[in-house]
Design a protein with these regions (language model features):
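Hinge/beta->alpha junction and helix N-cap segments in small-molecule ligand-binding domains
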Residues: 44, 70-89, 156-162, 183-192, ...
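Hinge/cleft segment of the Venus flytrap/periplasmic-binding protein
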Residues: 18-23, 297-353
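N-terminal signal peptide c-region/cleavage motif recognized by signal peptidases
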Residues: 12-14
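An alpha-beta-alpha
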Residues: 52, 153-203, 309-324
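Extracytoplasmic "Venus flytrap"
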Residues: 20-22, 29-51, 59, 64-66, ...
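Hydrophobic alpha-helical segments within soluble ligand-binding/sensing domains
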Residues: 18-26, 137-148, 153-178, 282-303
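Hydrophobic alpha-helical
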Residues: 107-122, 214-279
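Beta-alpha junction/loop-to-helix N-cap segments that form part of ligand/metal-binding clefts
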Residues: 75-140, 241-256
Length: 353
């Protein structure tokens, strides 16, 4: 109807009105509408979003030119926590998904597992293309496999083969085989800990985990795992929003505890953890960029999402903090030292093998 109305207006107007717009002006007309949905507002999600927008820009899709973005961040009440708060989040996600389905955008970006898992059914029924990012394991959000998400859905995942990641951990810390992990009911966190436990068994290592509430102080759980030197020999940080809440309080306390007790802290996700000696995992910004490349194909070429495989960072990033290693009196094996490169903020990047 809008096209017919425009045609009629042009026919009735003066001859000057039917002159074509300059190419530059046409390119700047809003062309694509993208909705973004996420739960909580944490730094890693912002990195993923920035990567996504960067990929669209690289494909000539840009806000103010031919892109409109509406971003919704569903709050999680960390102070209340618990079942009812989580149920409320699920309901909010579904309400937003219904609103988005009615708005009929060209594409939806879901950041994180909860937004993806609880919005996808509604968006699939409405035939609105869904691209996700910052998901630990696609299978946990309803995908058929790591690479196939079924009708109407594709995206990028933070998935890293946990056995390979722990092999790198063991190369840096060969004398530590008992790993402690503290997590919440965060879906990415639960999946990450389960994967770590399975990968550790294959390597003759062991993971002992403690679940806490998002409002809990982490220190009692650390003490229970450490058992005054009789328990775990290192701590590993899973992909859990808990560590990004309250200005990184849990992460800071974990780093301090590790320093006081000469226990290495490693993180199995590229999330800022003050005091961590080793980082192994996919980078949120890089994974967000991968999602953006898939979105560009859907928007520009009208490619169906199910045609596009789920992408992931093939070689995870490995960073070490040399100052923290020195404080722990740990020296890297010569084979790793020989292939290190200087990274930002004084870190060393190790070659992934």
């Amino acid at each position: 109807m809008k096209i017919l109305a425009l045609a009629a207006a042009l026919c009735c107007g003066p001859a000057l009105a039917i002159e074509p717009l300059p190419l530059e002006a046409m390119e700047q007309q809003p062309g694509f509408k993208v909705e973004v949905l996420q739960v909580t507002d944490i730094e890693p999600y912002q990195e993923a979003y920035a990567g996504f927008i960067g990929a669209l820009r690289a494909n000539q899709i840009e806000a103010g030119r031919n892109l409109r973005v509406n971003r919704v961040k569903v709050d999680f009440d960390a102070e209340r926590g618990g079942f009812w708060s989580k149920l409320g989040v699920v309901m909010r996600i579904r309400q937003e998904a219904q609103r988005i389905a009615a708005a009929r955008p060209d594409l939806v970006l879901a950041i994180g597992s909860p937004a993806t898992k609880y919005a996808r059914g509604i968006l699939e029924d409405a035939k609105v293309p869904l691209v996700f990012t910052a998901v630990a394991n696609p299978v946990d959000v309803g995908c058929v496999s790591l690479a196939d998400c079924g009708p109407g859905v594709t995206g990028s995942t933070l998935y890293t083969n946990m056995r390979d990641a722990l092999t790198m951990v063991h190369r840096v810390f060969p004398n530590a085989s008992r790993i402690g992990m503290v997590h919440t009911d965060d879906e990415n966190g639960v999946a990450n800990v389960a994967a770590a436990a399975g990968g550790a068994r294959e390597l003759g290592m062991a993971v002992t985990a403690r679940q806490v509430a998002k409002t809990d102080n982490i220190v009692p759980a650390l003490k229970a795992l450490h058992q005054q030197g009789e328990g775990v020999q290192m701590f590993a940080v899973p992909l859990d929003t808990y560590y990004g809440l309250h200005r990184y309080e849990a992460a800071i306390d974990l780093g301090d505890y590790g320093a006081e007790h000469k226990l290495p802290v490693v993180t199995l996700a590229m999330v800022r953890v003050p005091g961590a000696a080793l980082y192994v995992g996919a980078e949120f910004g890089a994974v967000g960029y991968l999602a953006g490349t898939q979105a560009a194909k859907i928007l520009k070429n009208h490619t169906k999402p199910e045609v596009l495989p789920v992408l992931r960072q093939e070689k995870p990033t490995v960073l070490v903090d040399p100052a923290r290693l020195a404080a722990l009196d740990i020296r890297l094996p010569e084979a790793l030292l020989a292939r290190r490169t200087q990274a930002r903020n004084g870190y060393w990047q190790l070659a992934w093998e």
